[in-house]
Regions:
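Conserved hydrophobic beta-strand within the GNAT/NAT acetyltransferase core sheet
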Residues: 77, 111-115
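Acetyl-CoA-dependent GNAT
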Residues: 3-72, 78, 96-97
Length: 146
């Protein structure tokens, strides 16, 4: 008998059926097939899905960032989401752990993530997963390229 009712898989290919399932279970920001296929075709990108037989219950998007200094590479855990109905069941922690395992496979020196301090769930998850809150005064700027 499995330990959990969910599993985590790295997605290397996306077809219409998977896209429809993702967009059904996570309708807030619908994915576009061509963009999703480009994302997963790049070996420096990671897409993890946590699934039950009926639901995509968690998603990770991460990127390998090559360094020019003494560090070999870093992994940016760009996005992690767990469906509210299944939070606090270890899915978020397992997704962070799977991302860290991928980073180790790549030889990355560390993995990092940004979040708002007001996001109590994320702060608790990252602490529980062994993350260190080591940059207290960070600002993020966005530049439009259009």
């Amino acid at each position: 008998m499995p330990e959990h009712a969910w599993r985590i898989d790295r997605i290397m290919e996306i077809d219409d059926a998977l896209l429809a399932r993702v967009n059904h279970d996570w309708p807030e920001e619908p994915w576009v097939l061509e963009q999703a296929q480009i994302f997963v075709a790049n070996p420096d990108n990671l897409l993890l899905l946590a699934t039950t037989p009926d639901l995509i219950c968690g998603i990770v998007l991460a990127h390998r960032l090559q360094r020019l200094d003494g560090l070999r590479a870093e992994v940016l855990l760009y996005s992690i989401d767990v469906d509210e109905a299944v939070q606090r069941q270890g899915i978020g922690r397992a997704l962070v752990d799977a991302t860290s395992a991928w980073a180790r496979e790549l030889g990355a020196d560390n993995t990092w993530v940004l979040t708002e301090r007001s996001n109590a769930s994320a702060m608790a998850l990252y602490r529980a997963a062994g993350g260190t809150d080591d940059i207290p005064d960070v600002a993020m700027f966005t530049f439009s390229n259009g």
